[in-house]
């Protein structure tokens, strides 16, 4: 009995040692500094930091990773023009959002349970200044009452299958999805929306334009000309594709908001049928972003906003993807085929094995007991006969 207890104690000791996490973690909330040309994120750690701080998906790029350690502070500074920092203009509220996702990894080589990922966002507000001067007015003045109508709030979604599908984060090559742009307004029949200047990039600077400045499609194999079911909605079906060596796709589009004329329809782009392979590779547009941080000088830019959507493409060319994987924020639960699937179906837990073993043992014991009783009863008459003789 002592031998079994010692063995059990050793097993528990080994299990407890193997389950020890990294002895460090983030203390409190991260400190974010929104600078004129960069975002700085700092973290306080419980013990001296010996890991990495990097932009999600860009660990291999040295400029997007900070490996400094030895102190109880970790952080990284990210310029706007590097590391896939997202920049989107907004009309409500009016300004520019700068967004990125930063990962704090405490192990030098692997991601562990104590690591954390933070979505960091800075907002640069545009302020309209009113300049006035003193003038003479007559005794009779006219009072003006102005009601400000808020601008629409727009979003870009990639849905599964069609316009009523669920948003997707993961998809396979060739899967049918629906690109949908929607603007919500507090008023009815007041605004018109036109989607244009759409690009897709891999998060590593390889940007391709798929809708031109007029809102016309450039490559029918990537995205066809958009349809406008309502004044503030646009959409089009498409099939999922990916870059040759990158799984993530980052879409960004511009939406122009105009005031709708009474008793008239919203103006829509007049586009010809797009040709195949007409997508245009673009250069870095950082200079344009820095201009929008200042007061825009061109009136045409005043009512243009940016929207973004992301999609992770899985390179599965055959077979169907489980529905749980295509839903937003769902767990990845794919199954292997062939022998792996057969082994997975036969795999049961240790608890179930114990229950089955006990049940089989009881069954064998009962069977032996019944057999013994039957044999005993059959032996009784023969013994009596021998006694009589």
From Swiss-Prot:
Its main location: membrane. Keywords: Cell membrane, Cuticle, Glycoprotein, Membrane, Signal, Transmembrane, Transmembrane helix. Disruption phenotype: RNAi-mediated knockdown results in shorter and fatter dauer phase animals (dumpy phenotype), which have no alae. RNAi-mediated knockdown results in a folded pharynx and intestine in some animals. One of its GO terms (molecular function) is structural constituent of cuticle. Residues 20-354 are extracellular. Residues 1-19 form the signal peptide. Residues 376-389 are cytoplasmic. It comes from the Eukaryota. PROSITE patterns: ZP_2. It is a single-pass type I membrane protein. It holds the Pfam family CUT_N. The keyword rRNA processing does not apply. Residues 33-278 form the ZP domain. It is found in: Cell membrane. Glycans are attached at residue 284. GO terms for cellular component: plasma membrane. The chain crosses the membrane at residues 355-375. Plays a role in alae formation in L1 larvae. This is Cuticlin-3.
